[in-house]
UniProtKB/Swiss-Prot annotation:
This is Doublesex- and mab-3-related transcription factor 3. DMA domain interacts with ubiquitin. Expressed in the ventral spinal cord, in a restrical population of neurons migrating ventrically in the developing spinal cord at 11.5 dpc. It comes from Mus musculus. The keyword Zinc applies. It is found in: Nucleus. Keywords: Developmental protein, Differentiation, DNA-binding, Metal-binding, Nucleus, Sexual differentiation, Transcription, Transcription regulation, Zinc. Disruption phenotype: Significantly increase of stride length and extension movements in all limbs. Mice have major difficulties running at higher velocities. In water, mice spend less time swimming and showed frequent twitching limb movements. One of its GO terms (cellular component) is nucleus. Probable transcription factor that plays a role in configuring the spinal circuits controlling stride in vertebrates. Involved in neuronal specification within specific subdivision of spinal cord neurons and in the development of a coordinated locomotor network controlling limb movements. May regulate transcription during sexual development.
Length: 476
């Protein structure tokens, strides 16, 4: 078949070719690739012959590296700020603890020596991170707490961020994270490090981020002569990259992240917090960022809604219905006959009719709060003295015109009797008036009128069903 509708035939290979397994991509040197040389990237950076090249492509690579470094630094800073936001302001002014190494040495020697011998002993070298973590694990086995280990394992990204910030060089950061992961993966390390007993009143544990943490025991006379002794008995002392902070035991990082979220956001429902935490993969920092960003976006939406709507004097009636529907949005198109155009705003000034034509004073509030916003139909009646009749102002509820009769008596005409030319020069309304076959429902005290439609029947031909894509045909 040579017709245009026939499928193409590719004769290069067999039709039923088995799929090959994708090979793992080996990273190459981008600078060498710019100059037509293929070089493996591992161990090549120091010996690259194009490392000092200043051509346009290599300069572009340098700029990309700067952007990536800036992004990493920004993420670390945001992680630090979110961690600091978990700490109450009343605890930030407390005096700081000693350095982590000295604290580790003090706590290690406190349970084995007397205060007199402790004052004469030189400080022991700080214990490695794996040993401290093993001690913390022994403590956890002796006193199990609900959700402590899942909270620790669920936040590896946070651990890497804290470790990367607290370490002086990248090498120490890698050593911290490697030792931490080795301690988590292999239980032999925990079994071999049995130098601490679970009954020890003072123990040095390692926080999730690799900070050395000193827990002061319940015995105040354990080391009174030591300069490293701290008076705070009920606080967790943390040495961080941005300064020294002191946390109560109720807010330490061993708690489940859901409990921390409940303490930070008491107004949120626990089910909502649990769903957000699951969506973030158990990462506490990501969940806090999501909740803070949602709160800021909600505040911004309320601010824009207040700017776009000038509510009347009885604005409490409209706040729960119109606050979430900003009229200035692009979806309030002129092409829909059942929507308010962008030029129409609510105003508390009923005398200034022409620039703000929809000033609707209310006689008394609604009998029940409606669930949908108030839609005002901009149709013209035969009686030009009052363009908006009471039966034109309807509340569109779940069933159309359900509450029309019980709400009709609550509206009055928004225009005085002398406002005959409000919509005559409006670009929304067509100058051609055709009779609408629909007949209005008679009402007590209201004349029987026939409504005029904005569009003719020809305007509805070849038109999309989507209300957002309707365009007013001004050819008529």
């Amino acid at each position: 078949m040579n017709g245009y509708g026939s499928p193409y035939l590719y004769m290069g290979g067999p039709v039923s070719q088995p799929p090959r397994a994708p090979l793992q991509r080996t990273p190459k040197c981008a600078r060498c690739r710019n100059h037509g040389v293929l070089s493996w990237l591992k161990g090549h950076k120091r010996y690259c012959r194009f490392k000092d090249c200043t051509c346009e492509k290599c300069i572009l690579i340098i700029e990309r590296q700067r952007v990536m470094a800036a992004q990493v630094a920004l993420r670390r800073q945001q992680a630090n700020e979110s961690l600091e936001s978990l700490i109450p302001d009343s605890l930030r002014a407390l005096p700081g603890p000693p350095p982590p190494g000295d604290a580790a040495a003090t706590a290690a020697t406190a349970s084995q020596s007397s205060p007199a011998s402790q004052a004469s002993q030189p400080p022991a070298p700080p214990r490695p991170t794996a040993e401290l973590a093993a001690a913390a694990a022994l403590r956890w086995v002796a006193e199990p707490q609900p959700g402590t280990l899942p909270a620790q394992l669920a936040k590896p990204d946070l651990t890497e961020e804290r470790v990367g910030d607290s370490s002086s060089t990248d090498n120490t950061a890698e050593a911290f994270s490697d030792k931490d992961t080795d301690q988590r993966s292999s239980p032999d390390v925990v079994k071999s490090k049995n130098c601490f007993t679970p009954e020890s009143p003072e123990i040095v544990s390692v926080d999730e981020g690799g900070y050395a943490v000193q827990k002061n025991g319940g015995n105040p006379e354990s080391c009174p002569d030591s300069p490293k002794y701290h008076a705070e008995q009920s606080h967790l002392l943390i040495e961080g990259p941005s300064g020294t902070v002191s946390l109560p035991f109720s807010l330490k990082a061993n708690r489940p992240p859901l409990e921390v979220l409940k303490k930070i956001f008491p107004n949120q429902k626990p089910t909502v917090l649990e769903l957000i935490l699951k969506g973030c993969g158990g990462d506490l920092v990501s969940a806090v960022e999501v909740l803070l960003s949602s709160r800021s976006s909600a505040a911004g939406a309320e601010r824009t809604a207040e700017e776009s709507l000038v509510l009347p004097s009885s604005g409490h009636i409209f706040e729960h219905t119109l606050g979430s529907y900003p009229i200035s949005s692009s979806k309030w198109s002129v092409g829909s006959a059942f929507r308010v155009p962008d030029t129409l705003r609510f105003s508390a000034d009923s005398s200034n009719v022409v620039p703000n034509p929809l000033a609707v004073p209310l006689q008394h509030p609604f009998p029940q709060p409606p669930r949908y916003p108030l839609m005002l139909r901009n149709t013209l009646a035969r009686n030009q003295s009052s363009p908006f009749l009471p039966n034109d102002v309807t509340l569109w509820n779940t069933m159309t015109l359900q509450q029309q009769y019980q709400l009709r008596s609550q509206y009055v005409s928004p225009f005085p009797s002398n406002s005959t030319s409000v919509f005559r020069s409006s670009p929304v309304l067509s100058s051609r008036t055709t009779e609408d076959p629909r007949i209005s429902i008679p009402d007590d005290g209201c004349p029987i009128v026939t409504k005029q439609s904005i569009y003719t029947e020809d305007d509805y031909d070849e038109r999309s069903d989507s209300s957002d894509s309707r365009i007013l045909n001004t050819s008529s």
